[in-house]
Amino acid sequence: MRVSQRLGRFGEDVAARHLSADGAEILARNWRCRDGEIDIVARHGDTLVFCEVKTRSGADYGSGPDAVVGRKAARIRRLAVRWLAEHPHPPAIIRFDVLSVYRERQGSVRVEHRRGAF
């Protein structure tokens, strides 16, 4: 596994723990279809949350939410429609979040959770 893949897996693990600690139930991780992948699908109360996780090893790469705009956000919305088609009876509220996981040089980890990011 490449370094970038290990970093991404680390970030998704941290994000899933963050969501669970916040009271969310993780329904799927790395859900795939022919059109792509959704990092995390969770239920938080009456809300179904589709999460994109961006992991950064420093500030040099910019903010995670800034990386999920335009075509990337539209692709995630399309994937969510596919997920909903395969999983009937979703909650009435649907939300798209971006979780940014920052792994600092000194080993600390910081999570920024932007709810309703797009």
Curated annotation (Swiss-Prot):
Family annotation (Pfam families): UPF0102 (PF02021)
Gene Ontology MF annotations: nucleic acid binding
Signal peptide limits: none
CDD domains: PoNe_Nuclease
Source organism superkingdom: Bacteria
Disulfide bonds: none
Family per record: Belongs to the UPF0102 family.
This protein's name: UPF0102 protein Franean1_1156
